[in-house]
Design a protein with these regions (language model features):
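Membrane-embedded, hydrophobic transmembrane alpha-helices
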Residues: 1-72, 76
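Internal/C-terminal transmembrane anchor helices
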Residues: 71-89
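Active-site lumenal/periplasmic loops and adjacent helix-entry segments of GT-C-fold
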Residues: 84-163
Length: 163
């Protein structure tokens, strides 16, 4: 476990490592659970998210590189601007206004509906390896990682629009 004070750059680097490890382990564990139960279930989703969280915490605690140079003020400024721009682009992909749903960019209209379809399809417990929900009788060849992770969050009780 790292001892002493950590720089902001070290904390950001370790947090990013922890989040990537947590997400990856949750997805891999979820897919293993889905294969063993012929579809993802709520207990499988909880187990997957829990194992991902544990792996992410361990990665955060033990991923310190003592030889990594400290970030400069310009590096931190660039990371902050990138973080703000990313938050702006992804935080409001889908949001409610009154009784209607809206999207931030009309360019996301077709793509977002595809992702929502995949998330709901996985969360409903589709048999694994699933067929394409769009093309009948064709195995799914789409990279499912992010959509599968969001389906785990849906099964854990998080609303789709928040994931």
């Amino acid at each position: 476990m790292p001892l002493g004070r950590s720089s902001p750059g070290d904390i950001l680097s370790r947090a990013a490592t922890g989040l990537l490890v947590a997400t990856s382990i949750a997805v891999v564990t979820g897919i293993a659970c889905a294969f063993s139960t012929k579809g993802i279930t709520q207990p499988g989703a909880m187990l997957s998210l829990g194992s991902g969280a544990l792996a992410g915490i361990l990665a955060y605690l033990f991923s310190r590189d003592p030889n990594r140079p400290a970030l400069s003020a310009w590096d931190i400024l660039m990371l902050a601007i990138f973080g703000i721009a990313s938050f702006r682009a992804f935080a409001w992909l889908l949001y409610a206004v009154g009784n209607s749903w809206r999207i931030l960019s009309p360019n996301n209209l077709g793509d977002l509906s595809l992702h929502i379809q995949f998330i709901r399809y996985f969360a409903e417990g589709s048999p694994f390896w699933p067929e394409s929900p769009i093309l009948s009788g064709v195995p799914l060849t789409y990279p499912i990682g992010a959509d599968f992770f969001n389906s785990l969050l849906c099964l854990a009780g998080m609303p789709l629009e928040c994931g």
